[in-house]
Design a protein with these regions (language model features):
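Hydrophobic core segments of alpha-helical transmembrane domains in multi-pass membrane transport
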Residues: 13-18, 292-298, 571-574
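An N-terminal hydrophobic leader/cap segment in hydrolases
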Residues: 2-39, 47-49
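Hydrophobic H-region at the start of alpha-helical membrane spans
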Residues: 4-13, 288-292, 332-333, 373-376
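Cytosolic-side membrane-insertion boundary helix
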Residues: 268-296, 304-328
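Conserved serine/cysteine hydrolase catalytic core
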Residues: 171-178, 290, 300-303, 307
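Alpha-helical transmembrane segments of integral membrane proteins
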Residues: 332-584
Length: 584
């Protein structure tokens, strides 16, 4: 009964979120959103979402805007900007960069896809070729700058959101290039040193690099327009009170972009910059995402009631978790080790796990390298605890959920693989159907669950075995060593989540409290900055995988069903959401 009720609730949430997100994205029918593909330089297929206001026709062409996401994101990350631009009568191409989303790899190639996106936008007969704007966040800004360099006469204005001009990522800026530039650089942007050479984001007004682009020597005044819009030399700096990824959730950051394009491209209607609705879509896709996670548990519960999978049902046998001081030592290790190793191991992974034809996603490889190293370290520490202490108390492979009292049950292990596959397949189907009928994915902010392309599916399959090993080890520690002997399944799930995910929350607090207090992120190497952003996603992911691990361990008495489900889910998540650097 509980599984059926959870199924109903999850389906309602998915449908509700999909319907509301679609209505907001389409502005209640005032905007048509098309999923488009087109051939770019060298025959690379490019992907985008095209937002077409009803007022834009071949007889009444409207200004066009190319909106481009940042590194390891996809086109939907720009939906807040795209929705609001389109509501103001502008045609918007929300582009997947090369090697991102559904655009062909490799990442960084062909000017990040920016020049091809601009060229495609100009082929549309309902776009006014004399009024085209470029907008890009972070690396999307570099893509926009590449477009401006390759096609200098084909755009009128540009908005750089949390981005910069200059080597090695983009052409150097000066008072004439790019034309009519607005820089929206948040007061707590994590990349201020990388982008503009200032350690504190709020000090970008003093950046010598930015002064050269503005053609001034004095401190830049935010909100003041320098140069001339008519001559194409206009410059302005806006500073919303948020972070680098926070630009996507900021009405101020989006409003500044709207305001600049109204000044440079002209107003198609009278909607002021502050009139925004995009956040309802963000809330709606979050509701769908929550529904999808609940569907995972509902599907698992109901599958265990079927004849084929009922043999997987069981209870933990002879549990011998750590107690007393040993438990607290284990908790401290599980708390500190992942966050202490996060930056060193991902940096090592940048060198040791380069993108290749086997594992073609650089950031995904770094995360996988970190996972494998942590799994090995966990195995060593767990073995020390077992042989030095817990074996004497009766702890064994049965206690840790690795085998049954009858021995290593390979049939159950194999059945657990099929069980996990069907659970994930059901959730995946809900994502595909939502994408098909409502043209949205499941997401909140920078956490997104999307349908995979064929190439991304092949990448996910390559991640499966190493990730299965990691999540088996994760479950053995979480359920075999750190499991509470008291309480209900729900209480044990909560405790598992605290043990499995609390460290990531503390890591984010350590990183972001100084930044939000007006300082900088406390890291010693600018190369680590990207993994500060990636760490944000680790918190919700480890909440989810901790819940899955605990739930299916309690339902089956073994670690495998939960571990394989986690491996498939995270392999899917990483393959679909990361940049692909090498074609396979």
């Amino acid at each position: 009964m509980r599984g059926k009720l959870l199924l109903v609730v999850s389906v309602i949430l998915i449908l509700l979120g999909g319907i509301v997100a679609n209505v907001v994205q389409n502005d209640s029918g005032n905007i048509q959103v098309r999923d488009v593909r087109f051939a770019g330089t060298g025959g690379k297929m490019m992907s985008g979402l095209l937002f077409i206001p009803n007022s834009a026709t071949p007889k009444t062409p409207a200004p066009g805007i190319l909106a481009i996401h940042g590194y390891i994101n996809s086109r939907e990350t720009q939906s807040g900007f795209a929705i609001e631009f389109a509501r103001r009568g502008w045609v918007v191409l929300e582009l997947d960069q090369t090697g991102h989303g559904y655009s062909d790899p490799g990442a960084f190639s062909n000017g990040y896809g920016g020049p091809d996106g601009l060229a495609y936008l100009r082929t549309l007969d309902f776009v006014d070729k004399n009024k085209i704007g470029l907008e890009g966040h972070s690396m999307g800004g570099w893509a926009s700058l590449a477009a401006a360099k390759v096609h200098p006469d084909d755009y009128k204005a540009i908005v750089l959101e949390g981005s910069s001009t200059g080597k090695p990522f983009a052409p150097e800026g000066d008072p004439a290039y790019p034309k009519n530039m607005a820089l929206v650089f948040s007061t707590h942007d994590e990349f201020s040193m990388l982008m503009w050479g200032v350690p504190i984001a709020g000090d970008v007004v003093k950046s010598e690099k930015l002064k050269k682009v503005f053609g001034v020597t004095d401190t830049i005044v935010p909100g003041k327009i320098y140069g001339s819009i008519e001559d194409g030399t206009a410059r302005v700096l806006y500073q919303p009170n948020t972070t680098h990824p926070g630009d996507h959730l900021s009405t101020a950051a989006i409003g500044y972009a709207i305001s600049w394009f109204q000044k440079t491209l002209g107003q198609e209607n009278t909607l002021p910059p502050g009139n925004q609705i995009w956040y309802w879509k963000e809330i709606a896709t979050l509701i769908s995402l929550i529904g999808a996670i609940l569907l995972l548990f509902a599907a698992g519960d109901l599958l265990l009631q079927t004849g084929w999978f009922s043999s997987l049902k069981g209870t933990p046998q002879n549990p011998k978790p750590a107690t007393g001081a040993a438990w607290w030592i284990g908790f401290a290790l599980m708390f500190f080790i992942p966050i202490i190793t996060w930056f060193p191991l991902t940096l090592i992974g940048n060198v040791a796990a380069k993108a290749s034809t086997i594992f073609p996603q650089q950031v995904g490889n770094c995360v996988l390298f970190w996972m494998m190293a942590n799994a090995l370290l966990s195995l060593i520490l767990f073995s020390i605890w077992h042989f030095a202490s817990n074996r004497k108390k009766g702890g064994n492979l049965i206690s840790y959920g690795l085998k049954t009292p009858g021995g290593m049950d390979w049939k159950k292990i194999g059945l657990s693989v099929w069980f996990a596959f069907l659970v994930i397949a059901i959730v995946y189907l809900s994502v595909v159907l939502t994408s098909y009928f409502f043209n949205v994915d499941f997401r909140f902010w920078i956490l997104a669950v999307k349908p995979m392309s064929l190439m991304q599916t092949r990448i996910a399959l390559r991640y499966l075995i190493p990730m299965a090993l990691f999540y088996i080890m994760f479950a053995v520690v979480l359920q075999g060593q750190m499991r509470s002997l008291k309480g209900s399944t729900a209480k044990r799930m909560i405790m598992s989540t605290v043990v499995g995910a609390l460290g990531y929350l503390v890591m984010l607090l350590i990183l972001y409290i100084p930044l939000l207090a007006g300082g900088a992120v406390p890291i010693s190497d600018v190369r680590m900055t990207l993994y500060v952003i990636v760490a944000i996603v680790m918190l919700p992911l480890f909440i989810i995988v901790s819940l899955i691990s605990a739930y299916f361990y309690e339902k089956t008495g073994l670690v495998y069903a939960g571990a394989f489900t986690n491996a498939m889910f995270i392999a899917w998540f990483i393959a679909a959401s990361q940049a692909t650097h090498v074609a396979i």
